[in-house]
A protein has these predicted regions:
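Amphipathic beta-strand/beta-sheet edge segments enriched in Tyr/Trp
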Residues: 48-56
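Negatively charged, low-complexity tracts enriched in Asp/Glu with abundant Ser/Thr
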Residues: 1-47, 60-65, 69-96
Length: 96
């Protein structure tokens, strides 16, 4: 399932969805909890990225993430956020 498919799903259920987390980091340590055994995996110094996690209310296991990466570590967080939101808007329009 590609990002456009996921965006379409998000749009279709947006009235039933919560935005779980929006991240906008130049450098980050990312923690991923594996659902099967509750192990916590730790990733250090990932590339700059912005992510938005969307999932239906009370159904965290159905969540999915949309990531946009940017290789320029000097970019301002606000600029990254604007870039992300503009890109997200364009992708949503493409789903029509």
């Amino acid at each position: 399932m590609d990002i456009k498919d996921r965006l379409k799903i998000a749009r279709d259920i947006q009235d039933k969805c919560l935005v779980h987390k929006i991240e906008c980091d130049v450098k980050t340590t990312f923690y991923d909890i594996e659902s099967e055994n509750n192990n916590i995996r730790k990733y250090h110094d990932m590339y700059p990225y912005i992510s938005i996690w969307i999932f239906p209310k009370n159904k965290r296991e159905d969540c999915f993430s949309l990531y946009l990466w940017n290789d320029d570590e000097n970019i301002k967080e606000l600029d990254k956020y604007k870039y992300f939101m503009n890109t997200l808007e364009k992708l949503i329009k493409e789903c029509d």
